[in-house]
Amino acid sequence: MSNAREIRSKVQSVKNTQKITGAMELVAASKMRGAIVKMNNVRPYVESANTIIKNVTMASIDYPNPYLFDREVKRVGYIVTSTDRGLCGGLNINLFKHVLKDIKKNLDDRVEVDVCAIGSKAATFFAKLIDVNVVATAHYNDKDNEGSIRAIRGALKVMLDRFTNGEIDRLYMSSNQFVSTIKQKPKLQTLLPIQDIFSKEELKTNKEQASKGHWDYIYERDIEEVLNALCIRYIEAQVRGAILENAACEQAARMMAMKNATDNASDIIDQLKLDYNKVRQAMITQELAEICSGAAAV
């Protein structure tokens, strides 16, 4: 058993760590509130983009846009959104496990895989995988929002160009979904081809509405230019929304991880204090025994 001085030193060390984790919990809680505001602010834009792209796509169903229609799948791409920092529990590893299941299915079907990694954790993880080709990386920094958006647009352009050129035949995005402060879950969604996103019921409904003239658009220029630009904006909106939602998930997961660490530190301190009292009691008992033995010898 450790002596009393060692135990006191351990108690002080754990208390210092507890102060750090407590402060990190408060910082994460503050950042989480800001991240949730950003996430909620971008959602109406993403939903509007969804509605517009569905309507325009159905009204232009005969236009051969490369982003719209299925083709034989020989190679797929994944945009994986992770964090740049750790200390957020199992947020990243749960996401990687989720996307790896889908990647493994494609590899088993002899479909090659390209990855665009957003966040240093994803870049490091997928760089170690032999069967996966990392073609682009980017980072999101909430302190440099404009710079981060430019970097992410550059990485996204790499994937879009590969899809347009026929180098990949399908594009997915993997990120975390914010369910609540204490729950975040990984999700995988299709970005391209766009028609894969629509259910059969949506396709049927939109075709009927378009044929009946329930809605229509007047194009300032030709439909080709408008639809190409709109598809790119739609995909950028999806990625931007996923990144902001993932940022909220990161701060929520970090807050809970630091709270658990702070609570565990309290349990460790209580146990160390109990050990200290046992050692101190044993020392007192030993001293009393020595005094009694000395008195008996006299």
Curated annotation (Swiss-Prot):
Where in or outside the cell? Cell inner membrane
Keywords tagged on the record? ATP synthesis, Cell inner membrane, Cell membrane, CF(1), Hydrogen ion transport, Ion transport, Membrane, Transport
Q: Give a GO molecular function annotation for the protein.
A: proton-transporting ATP synthase activity, rotational mechanism
PROSITE patterns in the record, alphabetically? Answer: ATPASE_GAMMA (PS00153)
Its name, as the record gives it, is: ATP synthase gamma chain
Q: Which GO terms describe its biological process?
A: proton motive force-driven plasma membrane ATP synthesis
**Membrane topology type:** Peripheral membrane protein
Quaternary structure, from the entry:
F-type ATPases have 2 components, CF(1) - the catalytic core - and CF(0) - the membrane proton channel. CF(1) has five subunits: alpha(3), beta(3), gamma(1), delta(1), epsilon(1). CF(0) has three main subunits: a, b and c.
Q: Which family does it belong to?
A: Belongs to the ATPase gamma chain family.
Q: Name one Pfam family in it.
A: ATP-synt
> Which species?
Francisella philomiragia subsp. philomiragia (strain ATCC 25017 / CCUG 19701 / FSC 153 / O#319-036)
Q: Please give an example of a GO cellular component term from this record.
A: plasma membrane
